């Protein structure tokens, strides 16, 4: 039988044409009652130009890495195997706008500090090899015009993730000489092993809609399957350990029905501190500053998401129970607040407290009513009737408002997980496994996760680029060696 690219059949059911070259290979069809297997017998005389890179996962890291490998080594055969739709997370990120990276972190030390898992390791060469500015230049050079918003988040000017997706898929299709990078969807790599010499990867690929298993022999393997169990399973089969994954970047469920009735109320800046029973010593990372939003189940917003990321494992082990202390007026000292309240009481003595909140506090009326209620004050109470002790209590409550965290947000809204292949088991300057040569990792399959703001995608771009570069160089070296250079 004739098969494309010497060792496998390519199918891509999204928007790309099938790219193929012909070469003769012997395949042995083995049938069983339940499944049909195809086993490839690879000719021993194949040349380095026939080397194959299989990328497991058609997300940001996988596609970017495949493109880079093909750029460095144009004759390298590259196939991406994705069980679903390629770049699906890119499509929905940033509310469909795609937060490509963060443009306010040119310094690698500052950038590394945005990764709860990875902040120590990323202080090295990782972002020096391919950082946010490199990512922005790459997309700009490939026709995606970008903009940087006030908080540093970088989006396509089109405000549509389709601009990023179209760019990546087009580049994957046209990159280098034939054959191009090929995407194979609707299939899952179920097992991975190596041959006796440890030079080849033997992969079994199952088609999701058919009882069919294909056997593929690859020279290089890049696992970039995100946080799915598939990637962790393959890594374990090839000798790697796995840090158990737990949710990161999620909202908090708050045990306060009066607060949740304020759904939609937002605060541009609060200081939130998370206290957990299983954390004996205070961690600076469990105190965060930023915007916060009240939801109908609790709290959300960047400050909460950052707390959930830094406290991901602590929260998991405590069954997502803890105490949250919020400073709603972080730019004012408590003594100044008490003085403001005392002066406000004198000035507006005959007004109802609900109708007259000190403007210095910048609080909406609905939340001001909530604060008064927690202090046992009726909104109809006149300012003249408010005791000095009550004024002190109001100031303290606004500076140290305690809220009980009762669990994660009720929806499966975590977008990122903590856990995966330990960074200690790979070389970050190449993304190659320290355990198995020619095995590479990139993206969320590793025990790396970032906070919101484009940092998780930057991890994907950087890891994919470094891995692709390393694979391409190895392939080129093999080509020169086979030619006698």
Please report, for each region that a protein language model flagged, where it lies by residue.
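Short hydrophobic core segments
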Residues: 54-56, 214-227, 235-236, 292-295
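A conserved FAD-binding loop/helix module that cradles the flavin
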Residues: 220, 224-238, 447-479
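Core beta-strand elements of the Rossmann-like FAD/NAD(P) dinucleotide-binding domain
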Residues: 49-51, 209-220, 287-288
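Glycine-rich FAD pyrophosphate-binding loop
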Residues: 54, 70-95
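Beta1/beta-strand and adjacent pyrophosphate-binding region of the FAD-binding site
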Residues: 44-61
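A conserved short coil-to-beta-strand element within the FAD-binding core of flavoproteins
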Residues: 180-199
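Residue-level recognition of phosphate/Mg2+-coordinating polar/acidic sites
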Residues: 106-109, 128, 133-152, 204-206, ...
């Amino acid at each position: 039988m004739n098969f494309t690219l010497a060792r496998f059949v390519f199918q891509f059911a999204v928007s790309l044409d099938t790219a193929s070259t012909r070469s003769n290979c012997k395949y042995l069809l083995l049938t069983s009652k339940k499944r049909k297997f195809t086993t490839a017998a690879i000719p021993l005389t194949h040349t380095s130009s026939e080397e194959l890179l299989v990328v497991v996962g058609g997300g940001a890291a996988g596609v970017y890495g495949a493109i880079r490998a093909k750029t460095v080594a144009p004759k390298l055969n590259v196939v991406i195997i994705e069980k679903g739709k390629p770049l699906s997370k890119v499509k929905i990120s940033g509310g469909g706008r795609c937060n490509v990276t963060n443009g306010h972190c040119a310094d690698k030390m500052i950038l590394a500090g945005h990764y709860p898992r990875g902040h120590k390791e990323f202080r090295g060469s990782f972002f020096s090899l391919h950082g946010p500015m490199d990512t922005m230049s790459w997309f700009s050079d490939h026709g995606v015009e970008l903009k940087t918003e006030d908080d540093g988040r970088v989006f396509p000017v089109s405000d549509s993730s389709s601009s990023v997706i179209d760019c990546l898929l087009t580049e994957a299709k046209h990159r280098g000489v034939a054959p191009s990078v090929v995407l194979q969807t609707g299939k899952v790599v179920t097992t991975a092993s190596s041959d006796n010499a440890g030079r080849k990867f033997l992969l079994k690929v199952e088609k999701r809609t058919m009882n069919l298993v294909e056997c593929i022999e690859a020279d290089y393997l890049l696992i970039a399957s995100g946080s799915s169990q598939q990637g962790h399973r393959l890594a374990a089969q090839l000798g790697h350990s796995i840090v158990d994954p737990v949710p990161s970047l999620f909202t908090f469920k708050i045990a306060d029905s009066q607060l949740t009735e304020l759904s939609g109320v937002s605060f541009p800046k609060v200081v939130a501190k998370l206290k957990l029973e299983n954390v004996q010593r205070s961690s600076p990372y469990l105190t965060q500053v930023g915007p916060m939003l009240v939801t109908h189940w609790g709290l959300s917003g960047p400050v909460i998401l950052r707390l959930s990321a830094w406290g991901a494992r602590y929260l998991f082990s405590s069954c997502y129970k803890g105490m949250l202390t919020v400073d709603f007026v972080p730019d004012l000292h408590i003594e100044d607040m008490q003085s403001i309240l005392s002066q406000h009481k004198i000035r507006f003595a005959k007004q109802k407290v609900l109708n007259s909140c000190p403007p210095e506090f910048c609080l909406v009326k609905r939340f001001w009513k909530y604060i008064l209620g927690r202090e046992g004050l009726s909104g109809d109470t006149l300012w003249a009737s408010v005791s000095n002790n009550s004024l002190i209590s109001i100031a303290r409550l606004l500076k140290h408002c305690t809220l009980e965290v009762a669990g994660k947000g009720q929806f499966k809204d975590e977008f990122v997980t903590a856990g995966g292949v330990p960074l200690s088991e790979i070389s970050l300057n190449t993304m190659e496994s320290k355990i198995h040569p020619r095995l590479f990792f990139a993206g969320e399959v590793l025990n790396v996760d970032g906070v919101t703001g484009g940092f998780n995608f930057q991890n994907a771009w950087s890891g994919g680029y470094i891995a692709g570069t390393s694979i391409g160089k190895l392939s080129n070296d093999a080509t020169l060696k086979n030619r006698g250079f």
